[in-house]
């Protein structure tokens, strides 16, 4: 209340000032650093109009705790944004205390949580497979890639496989054959865009994934997320008796203490292909 007549900046205004300050001319931060902040900010809509100085640590904590649909990685990005904004706000003398230092992430690692698409939901997806957004959902559901891995994948249309992956040692540089039923979808996207996902994953989730599932009335309960496509692939592997070790290999799961498999389990592309092709798509063969 040093100058009561001066309007105190809101969360949105501090964010905008922070971006200008952080990414000022002459700074050499990467595009992906900036994208992380932008992505985190899109989740904070309910804070936009609050006076930044008046925010309490308990409010920020409650806000993070409420974000049930978000993966731990996204929460980490949001908290990192809070920390950076407070760093700027201290510098600009907007606040005298960094409230975000008291906030923590209470979420568990959620890699294993999720709900595969049911047979009924898959049937509906295949029935509408002429839609490009649905094609991407099917690509992920029949290959097991995470949404965050798509844009960096090497796609070999001639030899019909994907190569790439992030996250873990076992997950990096893994090879997954392209299932014949999704090959044309993959080819169309790569030919048109050179990549499977030509937008950031937050945009995709908000403006493509959720709306199309709503339109088809298969949003699911709990609500399906793009990560559920990965769980769908895992479930399909189990349903069609894909070898357990090959399922792990294609999903990039580690073999834990099973050293023999990790070291001697080198599988050729063709061996993996014969496993992934055990997965049938009865919805389509019946229609044709």
Predicted segments, located by residue:
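Basic/aromatic-enriched alpha-helical hairpins
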Residues: 12-70, 85-90
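Basic, Lys/Arg- and aromatic-enriched nucleic-acid-binding interface segment
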Residues: 72, 76-78, 91, 95-147, ...
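Short, basic (Lys/Arg/His-rich) helix/loop patches that form interaction surfaces
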Residues: 127, 143, 176, 190-195, ...
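Hydrophobic (often cysteine-bearing) scaffold residues that line and stabilize catalytic clefts
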Residues: 11, 33, 37, 74, ...
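Short, polar N-cap/turn motifs at the start of nucleic acid-interacting alpha helices
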Residues: 156-160, 242-263, 285-288
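N-terminal helical hairpins
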Residues: 1-9, 24-25
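Catalytic-site neighborhood detector that most strongly recognizes the C-terminal catalytic loop/helix
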Residues: 165-170, 183, 251-281
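Conserved tyrosine-mediated DNA breakage-rejoining catalytic core shared by Y-recombinases
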Residues: 120-121, 143, 148, 152-186
